[in-house]
Regions:
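Active-site beta-loop-alpha junctions enriched in small/polar residues
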Residues: 103, 131, 161-165, 189, ...
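Short, conserved phosphate/pyrophosphate- and ester-handling motifs at nucleotide-, phospho-/glycolipid
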Residues: 42, 187, 249
């Protein structure tokens, strides 16, 4: 999607190609990136969206461009530069084992100054997270962008979405982004990696980073908890036949953000139900599926 209007939602940072082992000497390339998945999820549900990031001019980046266009994302926010692509090499899938190839790669060249003039006057929510907040100089660029948007009154969503690049050096960025956020989403895996456990103490540590913000804690097929406006809401995801859990967390936060933008009159409990249904709908498909509104509503209505 391009044109004179501006998206209400922008996800900034993560867009890459997953190289997934398909045999001893075979690999399959798949468009990916947590931030990109969230942008696609929100767009598929019905809110005009964009992925603000940078890709190369190579064959992998051509696929990312075409797939972003097909997903309805605003291509004015996706920059192209003459640099190599960022690749995630997924050499095992059960459980996932991976590493990244991306020295001086295209994602690091993202420049907010090249985004279309006036977009910040129209965006309602902006999303940040995952490896883009670890890889410099991109991490600093995105943290500064988040701070600027926050100062302008744009609501900020933050999902750490833990990857193996997040060492102790990530802590200051975690604290900075959490302080800016109006919504923080963490999984039980995030809690274990960042805080050494997934129990009440770990949840309390997340909430202490920004006591005023809403915090969504997901636990796969188990009950999720939402802390918001002084209340605690708990709900279980709809039961579905699981084909794949890849991208389920991205679909879940995408569902939450869509619900907050499209139906702000809903209660927090209703927003939580929508988010969990979106994540469950994604699990019915292989790959990082962006569910339709009909799929999500059908699960909510049972």
């Amino acid at each position: 999607m391009s044109g004179g209007t501006f998206p209400a939602f922008v996800s900034a940072g993560d867009i890459l190609t997953d190289m997934v082992r398909a045999g001893d000497a075979q690999w399959t390339s798949v468009p990916g990136g947590a931030g990109w998945n969230v942008a696609r999820a929100v767009a598929r549900l019905g809110v005009p969206s964009a992925l603000a990031g940078s890709i190369g001019e190579d064959c992998f980046s051509d696929v990312l461009w075409r797939t972003s266009d097909a997903a309805g994302l605003d291509l004015r926010f996706l920059q192209r530069v003459a640099r190599p692509p960022l690749l995630a090499i997924v050499h095992e899938t059960r459980p996932p084992a991976y590493f990244f190839i991306g020295e001086a790669s295209a994602d690091l060249a993202f420049d907010p100054a090249r985004l279309p003039a006036g977009w910040t006057d129209h965006v309602k929510w902006a999303h940040f997270g995952c490896i883009s907040l670890v890889r410099e100089p991109l991490a600093g660029t995105l943290a500064a962008l988040a701070a600027d948007l926050h100062a302008r009154g744009v609501k900020i969503s933050f999902d750490p979405n833990v990857r193996n690049l997040m060492t102790a050096a990530y802590r200051p960025t975690l604290a900075k982004m959490a302080a800016l956020a109006d919504l923080i989403k963490v999984s039980d895996e995030d809690l274990r990696h960042l805080f050494g456990g997934d129990g009440p103490d770990a949840v309390a540590a997340v909430r202490a980073l920004n006591p005023r913000t809403a915090v969504l804690v997901t636990r796969g097929a188990q009950a999720a908890t939402l802390y918001a406006d002084g209340d605690v809401h708990e709900a279980s995801p709809p039961r579905v036949e699981v084909a794949d859990t890849v991208g389920a967390g991205d679909a879940s936060i995408g569902g939450m953000l869509f619900s907050l933008m499209a139906a702000p009159q809903r209660s927090w409990r209703e927003h939580l139900a929508f988010a969990l249904a979106a994540g469950a709908a994604a699990c019915r498909h292989t790959g990082a599926h962006a569910p339709t509104l009909d799929e999500v509503v059908a699960l909510i209505e049972g």
